[in-house]
Amino acid sequence: MILNIHGYGGSAQNSAYTALLSLGCDVTSPQLDYDAVCPEKVLETLREMAVTCHADTLIGTSFGGFFAALLCAELHLPTILVNPCLMPFDILPRLGNTQPIQPLMVLFSKLAAIDSSLVHCIIGAEDEVIGDHAFTKRLLCDADLVQVPNGRHSGATLPLQSYFQTILGK
């Protein structure tokens, strides 16, 4: 079972979800309201889902990548990050999120425990939201990281189906 976590303002039926379904994967993809629920509660909900549905792989896109990375550090599950927003306390206010950033900063510190050997990551070279992903590259130095020329922030601009197929062996 794959737990797919969408990004800020995104949909449970995002590009990652669509690509996974096309490969015949068993996917759980919750719709999350990041504006209405505090980050700690989002993480708690996702943790419970991962355990309850016996997730064996996590996939997170953008802000969902932040939560997938946190769960990877905690649960030690293989994780695929798609244009991850690993510093949401910096990015989300620029996107209109008005929640306090301190809870995100507390959660951010937990990324230090991530085992990058469990992580695969695909990023767009022309990501207009995150930028050059310099922090992602440094944090995940041992990860399998693919940078897509001309790829933007939207997962629709990335070859997700073939990328997932290679990693998941589908």
Regions found by a protein language model. Name each.
Residues 58-59, 79:
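Conserved alpha/beta-hydrolase fold motif
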Residues 59-68:
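Gly/Ala-rich beta-loop-alpha elbow adjacent to hydrolase catalytic centers
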Residues 39-40, 151-161:
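Catalytic histidine-centered segment of alpha/beta-hydrolase-like enzymes
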Residues 140-156:
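Catalytic histidine neighborhood in serine/cysteine hydrolases
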Residues 1-53:
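Active-site catalytic motif of lipid deacylating hydrolases and related acyltransferases
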Residues 7, 30-35, 77-91:
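Active-site nucleophile loop of the alpha/beta-hydrolase fold
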Residues 121-127:
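Short beta-strand/loop motif that positions the catalytic acidic residue
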Residues 128-134, 155-156:
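Conserved alpha/beta-hydrolase "acid-adjacent" motif
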